[in-house]
């Protein structure tokens, strides 16, 4: 009976197997794929008005964040760090919080308990359309990080964040199964949200500095619609969203000159829906006819809303 490889031997075996079929990419190449040129604000160019990546580094039990600008120069600076994590998300501000999250560039799944049979089965299932094919496979040491990079980023509006979290949980339940992980009990599955940061490519894995996190390009970019097709619970599919526009501000100026003049040059706010004052007068009559006790406040709120839509003067 063959002796079971140690974790460090297994790390090397996984790299060798992945290297037979896929191209290994350097850290900066990987993060340029995650965040294409133009995704982030340029250093010193606040006028860009864009979000940025954030790296969290833990040293001596203290965590600090570093901003990633569009040149990605900081990626080289953190290479070899003992513990540095980053998520495929662009943030405004300096903290990786849900409130600061602006754009989702991909879905990253942490698959633990991956030995050689499980590694081979992951790609067997991908090749036979059982689970979605990932864009990059990361050897994180003990397991794999599967990155599904989106063709276009998705805006992280507050109402979408919970939907995307449930969507990702359902995707994890599909990918993490009894053939892809040695952790076969459902309670052993690790469910992480969309903001979860993962050990960065080029930094140390849990096995130490001689065992860096490595990335292999394994597939194409994907869409949310493509991933929806693999969900076991179709009610978790994300459909009410839109992708980031390809138009730059300069291109929008040429294509929509009137919009550019009003919104950008003159700084006008987006137009509201305007209604004739008949609606306001009708609701005011309804209130005078008898707003019931306990509902007066709600009636006045609706009246105020109609007043705005009907352009009723404040003094009235």
Predicted regions and their residues:
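Short, surface-exposed ligand-recognition loops at beta-strand->loop->(often short) alpha-helix junctions
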Residues: 110-118
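Helical (often loop-to-helix) elements that flank the catalytic cores of nucleotide-handling enzymes
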Residues: 117-128, 150-181, 208-226
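Catalytic micro-motifs at enzyme active sites that drive phosphoryl/nucleotidyl and oxygen chemistry
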Residues: 91-99, 123-141, 184-190
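Catalytic "initiation/cleavage/transfer" segments centered on a nucleophilic residue
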Residues: 62, 93, 179-265
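Modules that initiate DNA replication and primer synthesis
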Residues: 152-154, 234-316
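Short, well-structured alpha-helical interface segments that form or flank functional binding sites
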Residues: 76-81, 141, 145, 195, ...
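Histidine-centered divalent-metal-coordination microenvironment in nucleic-acid enzymes
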Residues: 109, 132-163, 190-206
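DNA replication initiation on ssDNA origins
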Residues: 1-106
